[in-house]
């Protein structure tokens, strides 16, 4: 897991930074697969900070493929940050039923692991 506090980056309107005085941020992760020098991870944010997953991965030396803000501007692998919400659990606002919404991995991300 990654337990690093996050705060706004004073030099940017968009970026966040790891800062000991920032808001607590905790991310659990599990490596699911490796291929072509890339890894498929399950990331589970335990807090909900802006850019938390992107910043936490970059801060441990593993930025997301295609992440121009916290990684590299190289868009040859994928033209966007390789981040996808596969499964979301939420409570229905009327019935209170717990819903699990699943979205398969998009084609551009599947190609990265072929």
Regions found by a protein language model. Give the residues of each.
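RNA pseudouridine synthases
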Residues: 1-114
